[in-house]
Curated annotation (Swiss-Prot):
GO terms for cellular component: cytoplasm. Disulfide bonds: none annotated. Signal peptide: none annotated. It is found in: Cytoplasm. Mn(2+) 2 binds at residues 261, 266, 284, 345. SUPFAM superfamilies: Macro domain-like, Zn-dependent exopeptidases. Its cofactor is Mn(2+). Presumably involved in the processing and regular turnover of intracellular proteins. Catalyzes the removal of unsubstituted N-terminal amino acids from various peptides. The keyword Transmembrane does not apply. Mn(2+) 1 binds at residues 266, 343, 345. It catalyses: Release of an N-terminal amino acid, Xaa-|-Yaa-, in which Xaa is preferably Leu, but may be other amino acids including Pro although not Arg or Lys, and Yaa may be Pro. Amino acid amides and methyl esters are also readily hydrolyzed, but rates on arylamides are exceedingly low; Release of an N-terminal amino acid, preferentially leucine, but not glutamic or aspartic acids. This is Probable cytosol aminopeptidase. The keyword Transmembrane does not apply.
Length: 491
């Protein structure tokens, strides 16, 4: 169940089930905690001195019926070392608080940590990110669970200390986009097919003024010459779709265009994946899910810009008609591609989608894809990989990610890597060999974005958590939404 958010800043007298305040490792209290301490005759200070209240990072202490405090509960969240308290510590504190309260009987709470000073961040940022982080922590997947396992208990309403209504609304919009993306990513592949992704896009656009959807089927894609995308789709009974979503909030200005890889399940094709990886391949559409989530955020925030989202939705499966290693296919651009590996399919659907996207004459073109395991090996789960030949665009995206702690790290896209994609039988080979796999994948895409202000985000390491119980993260909806907020502010 999604949280309801409001603004409030009368801490000691707030009419809520619980007040959320903070304490540092040295027992220093946040301003709201100091007010409660004074109202209760020094109760918080006494508990801290006795060791019954911890300010260590990750610690939460739930107190009941403090004298002089109207709320029946006070949750004290440990903030760690005061000198090191910054963006990641703040976001962790939000999550710690929400998880602690979701497990109990508290239905409403006031979160006061948004009033704590954070270096290089303002009050609007604190409110906006508190909403996003709280909603992320409260998320529970229930779509395919039995009725008895649905989650409607615990915290339902969270007031954020502050008075910036715009920041609250933006936070709610971005949180909705993140949740939308996570829900799509978490759905099993027999639910989330290419046709389902198309239906979801049409439904959302139909419910919001200024948004529209266009869906291309395989016959329309064939007429456009999308031979690369259609080659990947040949082996599946779930036929492909090209999902195109448009938001018109910026008059006649050129749109920002996001392209997201939408492989709804990736068997690897003839180059079949093995156990130990294939069971997580429902997440191979998270690039598509996350650009749709960013679209949701932009529409709900009513951003004053134009946005186009393009998602090639395809299942990479195997039957007698599946494409093979050594096939030569013709892309929409006219370039021919020799298939070296059918498990390097993401770039084959993206190249046609990127070519199609250029008809919108984008102000900037950004693709998002769970493209390579090589990027995950290089960067782990902490950051996405970013590639671009346009320093200004790369710097905008890097700054947006750093601002909201949804970070990316730039990798080179030098011409010296391009010969690794040479083919004897076609214009380009779809793999680059053993080395620099993330970079050569970016180089492949660069051949289909010439003349465009373009960047590539490889999100293989950040799109989902590891393991059997891992879930879609919604990254980088935060980065992309902040980037669009920045563009709207400059307009």
């Amino acid at each position: 169940m999604a949280l309801e958010f409001t603004l409030n800043h009368v801490a000691p007298a707030a009419a809520v089930d619980c007040l959320v305040v903070g304490a540092y490792a040295d027992h220093t209290l946040t301003p709201a905690a100091q007010a409660l301490d004074a109202a209760s005759g020094g109760r918080l200070t006494s508990l801290a001195q006795r060791g019954d209240l911890s300010g260590k990072t990750g610690a939460t202490t739930l107190l009941h019926d403090l004298p002089g405090v109207s709320a029946p509960r006070v949750l004290v969240v440990g903030l760690g070392d005061a000198a090191r308290f910054g963006v990641p510590q703040y976001l962790k504190a939000v999550g710690d608080a929400v998880r602690a309260l979701k497990a109990g009987a508290t239905r409403s709470a006031l979160f006061t940590l948004s009033e704590v000073a954070i270096k290089d961040r303002d009050a609007a940022w604190a409110i906006r990110q508190a909403v996003i982080a709280a909603d992320h922590a409260a998320y529970r997947y229930t779509a395919t669970l039995g009725k008895k396992k649905t989650d409607d208990a615990g915290l339902a309403q969270l007031a954020i200390a502050g008075d910036d209504a715009l920041a609250l609304a933006q936070g709610q919009a971005i949180a909705a986009g993140v949740e939308f993306a996570r829900e799509l990513g978490n759905l099993p592949p027999n639910y989330c097919t290419p046709a389902y992704l198309a239906e979801v896009g049409v439904k959302f656009a139909g419910e919001h003024d200024g948004a529209e959807a266009e869906i291309l089927d395989e016959h329309q894609m064939e007429a456009l010459g999308m031979g690369s995308l259609l080659a990947v789709a040949r082996g599946s009974a779930n036929r492909p779709r090209l999902v195109v979503l448009k938001w018109t909030g910026g008059g006649d200005a050129k749109p920002y265009v996001l392209v997201g890889k939408g492989i709804t399940f990736d068997t690897g094709g003839v180059n079949l994946k093995t156990q130990g990886g294939i069971e997580e391949m429902k997440y191979d559409m998270c690039g598509g899910a996350n650009v749709i989530g960013t679209f949701v955020a932009a529409v709900k925030a009513k951003l004053p810009l134009n946005l186009v989202v393009v998602v090639p939705a395809v299942e990479n499966a195997i039957d007698g008609n599946a494409y093979r290693p050594s096939d030569v296919i013709t892309s929409m651009s006219g370039k021919t591609i020799e298939v070296g590996n059918t498990d390097a399919e993401g770039r084959l659907i993206l190249c046609d989608a990127l070519t199609y996207a250029q008809r919108f004459e984008p102000a900037a073109l950004v693709d998002v894809a769970t493209l390579t395991g090589a990027c995950m090996v290089a960067l782990g789960h902490q950051t996405a990989g970013l590639m671009s030949k346009h320093d200004d665009l790369a710097n905008e995206l890097l700054a947006a990610g750093e601002h909201v702690f949804d970070r990316a790290w730039r990798l080179p896209l030098w011409d010296e890597y391009q010969p690794m994609l040479d083919s004897t039988f076609a214009d380009v080979y779809n793999i680059g060999g053993r080395w620099a796999g993330a970079i050569t994948a970016g180089c492949f895409l660069s051949r289909f974005t010439e003349g465009q202000r373009w960047a590539h985000l490889d999100i293989a390491g950040v799109a989902s958590d590891e393991g059997k119980r891992g879930m879609a993260t919604g990254r980088p909806v935060g980065l992309l939404s902040q980037w669009l907020l920045d563009q709207a502010a400059r307009a």
